[in-house]
């Protein structure tokens, strides 16, 4: 018995190592494809922009007024036409949709929604709307991971792993921060850290970063060479307190503006999108720096090439406009713009405290980290992103300070979760699954499945006698197109009646005498289904159909028997 237990444990470990290797290979493939897809997405967005803007593709303020207004109006009208023609099921895009599909549809992300996300986000970004590319990148990466998992027929934990690989790969390719990409997948999408997913997700993230770096080039938002060391003085922390207060104000403004606009989702697409076009067009005339993602404005402010008459006004308007644009349903991201808003806020605080150029860069980084952490409740992602961007740990203490304070204040005083969690909550959905659901999702049907023998309806008597030495308890045979289940013991009991004389179920075929199972036995019809990806799907099937047993297809010619009773016993045992 001990030998059998050791063998069982060893084979279980071997299977887990095989699963890890398969997931690592698929994760690497997911990272490769995510990197290529993000490079293509980048080209689709920025090549047309460079045609009419020039090398500085995010510099919409350099365009004539009529061009700025024309681009905004044209982009909004094209988006309104597209979304008014598409069925409503294809309108769902972005990070909240990814979390919804993960929690309510086992991570199954339709391809066509990703296609809509790709082109609609590209149109919005090219036209200068105040949105980002990072949210759409998450949707595209997650869809790619889910597609690979579906084609590989992975169980549910494998689907979730590749989903995380796709998200991490996409974020890593966009920001070129591989570790921050991994943490983003766990903190923002899964809302928990999952140790068993780490290796494949890390591999995907690193490969996507390498692909992005080689195809796009370095994506340095601004020069950080001036940061060599940080003096942890009291003046620094006074300034950090001021920065946190400003960031929390901006985060609350950003979130509450969106919340107030979610109530307008009942308006027509034309009304909402043209409203965005009108407001953005007016701002494009008087404050063109608010157009686009804002990366170039931040970079120019730090280098001294751009001077705005009121940086504070720019920050407030950019915050409200981004929330306004996203809140009314424009299919873009909010991660990039909030990152830039935080950077601008950091520069504003640095100017108030009359800091030098090096401190301006430092506070821009701190503002970016604090804003990301406060809006998306992703403290580790924000912290690690800053460390990876600076290639230095010298900023870690002030970054920790502002990130933790910003997150705490948003949670404790404003009672606000991540903007994505708040969006799902507004829609009446949960952003997490219960521990019981998670347990079911992380197990396949193998622990509750029993082997069965698949035999024809007519079986030679000699073969029936051989069943006495079999260790399998159940036999399945077909009557027409239906599968019927019978216990092996019942077959042997029927066979023993031959000692009493000829039986009605005997059938002669040439020189062979066979048993007709349909006449000899009282069998139970049992349906056949494809193997579910998790015990959650299996339990859902039993609850829906109310049947006690089902055959699960293992291969084209073999089945396993799963019973509701055995499933309940497994769940009760797991609670002990």
For the regions a language model picked out, list residue spans one by one:
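Cytosolic regulatory modules rich in charged/polar residues
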Residues: 509, 519, 523-576
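Amphipathic coiled-coil signal-relay and dimerization helices
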Residues: 483-490, 558-564
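Acidic/proline- and glycine-rich, intrinsically disordered low-complexity segments
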Residues: 504-517
